[in-house]
Amino acid sequence: MLSLIAILCACTGPTETNTGTSSETAGSATGTETATEAVTGTETGSAAADTDTQTETETKPTVSEDVIGIANVANAGYAMAGSCRNTDGYSNLHANDNDLSTPFSSQDFSAAESDVYLFVDLTRAYTVRSVVLLPAAGEAELFPVDFDLQVSDDGQAWTTVQSRTDVSGVGEAGVTVDMGGVEASFVRLLVHRMAEDKGKYRFALGEMQVLADVRRTDNLVLRQNDIWLYTDTSATLTAAYRRIANVTEEAPLRFFTDDPAVAEIDCNTGSITPRGFGDTLVYAYDGENLTACHVRVLDDTQTAFRISTFYHSNFGYPDVIPACLDYMKEAGIGFLEETRTYDAAGNQVCDYMMYLCAKRDIFYSVSDPLHDLALSKASQSRIIELVQKYENRAGFGGIYLVDEPHEESNDYARVARIIHDYNHHITPHLNLLPIGGFPSWDEYVSEYCAITGGTHRMEYLSYDNYCFMADGGFNWGVYNSLNKIRQYGLKYNASTGYYMQCMEIRGAYRISSDEELLFNASMGLAYGMKNFKWFVYLTPIGGGGEPFTTGVIGPDFKPSVMYEGVKAANARIAEWGKVLGKSDAVEVYHSDAVSGNEVVPEDFVIRQTSDNAAIYALYQSLEGDGRQYVVVVNRDFGKGRDKEFTFAVTEGLPSLELYDGGAWTSLDIGSGSFSLFIAAGDSAILRLPEGYDFRRPAAKPSDNLALGRAAFVSSSQYTFWTESDKASYRLTDGETASGGWLAGNRDTNPIVLIDLGEVRQISRVELFVFVTMEKRFPGSATIEVSADGVTWTQVFSSQITAGADGSASCGFDKADARYVRITAGGVRCALGEIGIYAQ
């Protein structure tokens, strides 16, 4: 119950609102008989309605907790079924949407006596008076024949309240079942016998209504009652309808907040402005009814790694998923990467899964139905509408794009960029292919980065490649893949992530031991990963033709033999993230030569004097003065292979600290050496003194400031299945006579952005012809520069023509720039090279 004590709440004047929060959440009313009226909310609460609205503080009103009537509360909850048709206009979402024209149906069964459930999660406890089951339009003969009505406070343990048998001849009014005022958070229809339909058996409903006591504190139904924000985002609190019409439709809404230090709310418009991290309640009041909404302002300034898991809802059922999510929370997994729209029973799960995840403080990457309707080809406005559909909802963390795209990867890169540009807190969830199988992998990755990235930090550049083989062997190529992704992340300013093996596929990959699970995480640490992702959570039994036997959660929906190892590894990842979450692995070495990696140099800051297989990483902070750290990984992950490492330190190193147990401990290096005990597959983090830089000296700088730098483009074309001479990275590879970049087919006036890495003074840009595509050379060029990626200054705009040497020189007054943005005049333009010079 809401507190009835009046409190003083901050009330601010009109502020700019975020119109992207207006879409309805799951279960919103559609305006039929039980949703008594639509509420315009912010429009009715205007300053003209009350000249006293701009006061600095206002008192939140108190309202009576007396019951004011009985109304349907199911439509503000979530309906899920043990069997659900999701074709031909049927959906679980229709079971409680207050619209008799949209039906629910179970799938077909071969026997009439098949227990099938349909439940409504009311999201809180109500005193339930009755349940009304309304027949599906045109399918009254498919009304349940024998059934129980049950209640639960947790969705797990059910109590039967009423039963009906031999039900037939149901009219439009349906069947009303007295529930006797039972307290319930869940109401379930358990059907024991179904009617025949074309030789099969199923049941169908038009609506399942739950009539319960309504009070002034739950009569006014909000479009969102749980909102997550960041300090640079906003939302607007709006109301959907009143369950009981106890005030006029024109009644103005007023808004209040419990804690203005966390979130202020405009008294008239309901516009919520974050002010600090934390949780608070905000309220909407219409003169009679007072409804609360939880608001959380998330702290994205913390230094941390993300711990995620790859998730297939199509291998789970509604009655077991809450427990599986509890296991996820307990294991320390904070981000669920959904890849399916429907569960194994046929339910559309987007809204309910997000709700369940939010209750457990887990972020959810949604697989919206639009994903099945060519998301890669969707317009920019349609993609933004998709983000707005879920924006600011509790639990919303990302949008699933695709797993392992092939030649369509550039199309998905465009989608990822649109999502980031609209709201950089939302993660476009996409996983790239591992190395191998096609010759254009470098072009494949670089073009994804070039289209997705820009002046911002990209999150996340992600891929998979597994190493613990079914025959007991180890895939040594994983080190090359990790290093390649690390290098692309550094070049294109991308946080990286990778999938860690936690499954068994017969004949391919083995069940990982605790030490192997930890080593999987330690490898990610060594190579600078920021997103540690477990593959796979639910066991994909029969999925995709691969013979999976288990995942983090076994086929019985209980923790598998690997669960405790995953949990322990996650605890280590969380500790590492507190130190290195905002640092990059700028150099990585091995104690010996392995695939695609260098041997640790003799002049590295520490030199091992023992003889243990190890990985070394030099980290540099992205903040402040760039403090440096060293990570050492025990590469021996066999059971019981804990090792003592001894090291000599570089001459003149004044101090060295070890991160242990959440604190820094000074090591005794007075003798020029020290030792560490590192468990099998585990790692150690060392902190170097402030002001010390132990990176290898950079190569002699070129006069061409663009050489080797990241080139970001508005579009790109390359050949996926064969070696390609077309790629954006060729714009800065120093080769003017071969290869280059080709814009997309419909890209008018395409853009290239060069990141110089730091602010430099420049006065000339050279544009070179793509030697096999001279006719695609742009007819004009506009050049803009920026020091911060926010404020831009145009320094050149003119028609251009390539000279005899195949280049056009664009000169201008000296300007300070980190970013150089070139707009090429024309359609499907091509360039062979770009040079940027100080003189």
Where are these regions (language model features)?
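C-terminal motif of bacterial Sec signal peptides marking the signal peptidase cleavage site
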Residues: L8-A10
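Ser/Thr-rich, Pro/Gly/Ala-heavy low-complexity intrinsically disordered linkers and tails
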Residues: T12-S64, V282
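Low-complexity, Pro/Thr/Ser/Gly/Ala-rich linker/spacer regions in secreted
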Residues: T55-N75, L211-R223, W228, H294-A304, ...
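Extracytoplasmic soluble-region selector
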Residues: P61, E65, R215-T301, A699
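Predominantly extracellular/luminal regions of secreted and cell-surface proteins
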Residues: S64-N98, A699-D733
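Aromatic, loop-rich ligand-recognition surfaces of beta-strand-rich domains
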Residues: D99-T160, G171-R216, D733-Q794, A804-Q839
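Exposed beta-strand face motif in extracellular beta-rich ectodomains
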Residues: S185-V187, A235, G278-V282, A684, ...
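Glycan-processing catalytic domains of CAZymes
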Residues: D299-P654, D660-G691
